[in-house]
């Protein structure tokens, strides 16, 4: 077995597929999910190494795994304690498959317990950054520096290892920070190598994927595009598809893919609900209709959506009403333009994760919903939806969609457009949405985007936008007392939107944005800056 991290050949950018397609002879790493918030992030990290990965339930049987024939298995972290009576367990026959296994946090503790070791509540939990001291630098820890920072988040610890296991690394508070049974290719880490805070975490994941599982870097953007087009054609055949085009990278990439797959059987419809940013509806129609000759049906539904939100202040109700009205408009327009059999949506992994995030109840052992917020693409769909869904991007993260978009010729201004929520400015207005408040926020938001664009900093941020609060503050302008709205600036740095940090913006830029908003946007006399990270906050205010 090689002891050097493989240097990958110059391959195209890597991406995942949408489903487990048994017809394809594809190497795969399976992640068994025990309710961790990072399970999909593990999958993303593996895909970045040009190896396909899929997240499955922890209940997946050893027999099913044998049929799937993965090159390796990863047991995710989770919020529970393995010594609880109803703690989630994996099929113990997994250990007899002869497939390499890596347990992460809870996954490592479960491995230890099921194989005869012992796990107890730690005298002192370990949360945040920790220095990893390496005792055995082979296999899993090849090219991981001694003293490297890793991210810990655990209240339990392994106090006795199963027979055949040895300690690979420790930290100040955790004796068994990394363990291994080299003969059986069973490995465990108490930390989270998948998160950005773990400095050499990617090196460790590559070691598992390439050294231990002996995978090859075969998963590419081109492979995803080719397979997705084949899957769309196989599913849709000669049926007609209706696509909700928003102008963002998700729906635009989907439009290009669908147009390549089914041509004129695709109808793109842009429903202008009145919640988009300044100038976006006009620019969208120009790009698709005139520049790329992909016909788009324009529907002006601004008054309908605004009427639905009269008197509504609850953010979840806003999302539900917008989602419901969106589908209602779709159904009405489909009768006029149809018939249509499929509704195409640019749903992504983070949409699915945040709309129905799951946990495992320690009392019952069952997965339960821990709802964060209803996404426009997911939570707002009515139960009587007439369309069948086609969601080719459902397993992709935002950066992966951008890679696909770029590879199929999507304009760079769309590829690198900041993420924008389906309900648009309606959920950046805290409280009731009115025409007046929309105009205030739209103008303030334009100033933010205009200034960071002038400074050449647009692509330095994951998102940069304004939020309008439902309060007023006292000010003085031209020797006159004012009583007007405050605007919140939200500029975010992130890799994937799963976690995010507030951006350390130069004071001069903040000052310029603030001065312009106060002077150019009628009804605003104060600007504040949001310095909350995700978690504990979310990127959007609603």
Curated annotation (Swiss-Prot):
Pfam family for this entry, one: GATase
Metabolic or biological pathway: Purine metabolism; GMP biosynthesis; GMP from XMP (L-Gln route): step 1/1
Domain of life: Bacteria
Keyword Metal-binding: no
Key word ATP-binding present: yes
UniProt xrefs under PANTHER family: GMP SYNTHASE [GLUTAMINE-HYDROLYZING], GMP SYNTHASE-RELATED
NCBIfam families (alphabetical): guaA_Cterm (TIGR00884), guaA_Nterm (TIGR00888), PRK00074.1 (NF000848)
Protein name: GMP synthase [glutamine-hydrolyzing]
Taxonomic classification: Bacteria, Bacillati, Cyanobacteriota, Cyanophyceae, Oscillatoriophycideae
């Amino acid at each position: 077995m090689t002891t050097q991290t493989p240097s990958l050949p110059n391959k195209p950018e890597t991406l995942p597929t949408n489903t487990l397609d048994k017809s394809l002879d594809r190497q795969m790493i399976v992640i068994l999910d025990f309710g961790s918030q990072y399970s999909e992030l593990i999958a993303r990290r593996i895909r970045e190494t040009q190896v396909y990965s899929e997240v499955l339930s922890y209940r997946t049987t050893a027999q099913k795994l044998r049929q799937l024939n993965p090159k390796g298995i990863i047991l995710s972290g989770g919020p529970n304690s393995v010594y609880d009576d109803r703690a989630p367990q994996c099929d113990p026959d997994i250990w007899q498959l002869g497939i390499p296994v890596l347990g992460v946090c809870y996954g490592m503790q479960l491995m230890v317990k099921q194989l005869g070791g012992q796990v107890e509540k730690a005298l002192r939990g370990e949360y945040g950054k920790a220095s990893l001291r390496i005792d055995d630098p082979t296999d899993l820890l090849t090219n991981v520096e001694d003293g490297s920072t890793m991210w810990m988040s655990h209240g339990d610890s392994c106090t006795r290892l199963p027979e055949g296991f040895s300690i690979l690394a420790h930290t100040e508070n955790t004796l068994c920070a990394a363990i291994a049974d080299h003969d059986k290719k069973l490995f465990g880490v108490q930390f989270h190598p998948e998160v950005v805070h773990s400095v050499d975490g990617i090196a460790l994941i590559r070691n598992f994927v390439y050294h231990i599982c002996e995978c090859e870097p075969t998963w590419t953007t081109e492979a995803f595009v080719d397979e997705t087009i084949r899957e769309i054609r196989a599913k849709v055949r000669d049926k007609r598809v209706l696509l909700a085009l928003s102008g963002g990278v998700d729906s635009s990439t989907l439009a290009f893919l669908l147009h390549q797959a089914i041509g004129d059987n695709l109808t793109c419809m842009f429903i202008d609900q009145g919640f988009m940013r300044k100038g976006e509806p006009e620019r969208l129609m120009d790009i698709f209709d005139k520049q790329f000759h992909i016909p788009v049906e324009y529907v002006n539904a601004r008054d309908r959506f605004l009427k639905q939100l009269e008197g509504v202040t609850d953010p979840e109700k806003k999302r539900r009403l917008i989602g419901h009205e969106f589908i209602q408009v779709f159904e009405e327009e489909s009768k006029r333009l149809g018939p249509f059999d499929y509704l195409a949506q640019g749903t992504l992994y983070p949409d699915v994760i945040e709309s129905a995030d799951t946990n495992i109840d320690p009392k019952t052992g069952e997965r339960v919903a821990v709802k964060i917020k209803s996404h426009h693409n997911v939570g707002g769909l009515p139960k009587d939806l007439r369309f069948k869904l086609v969601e080719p991007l459902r397993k992709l993260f935002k950066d992966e969609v951008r890679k696909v978009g770029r590879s199929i010729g999507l304009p760079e201004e769309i590829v690198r457009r900041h993420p924008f929520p389906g309900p648009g400015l309606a959920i950046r207005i805290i409280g009731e949405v009115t025409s007046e408040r929309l105009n205030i926020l739209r103008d303030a938001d334009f100033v933010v985007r205009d200034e960071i664009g002038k400074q050449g900093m647009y692509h330095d941020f994951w998102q940069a936008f304004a939020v309008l609060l439902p309060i007023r503050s006292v000010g003085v302008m031209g020797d006159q007392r004012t009583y007007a709205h405050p605007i919140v600036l939200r500029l975010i740095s992130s890799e994937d939107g799963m976690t995010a940090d507030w951006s350390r913006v130069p004071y001069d830029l903040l000052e310029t944005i603030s001065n312009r908003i106060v002077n150019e946007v009628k009804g605003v006399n104060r600007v504040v800056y949001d310095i909350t990270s995700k978690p504990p906050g979310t990127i959007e205010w609603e």
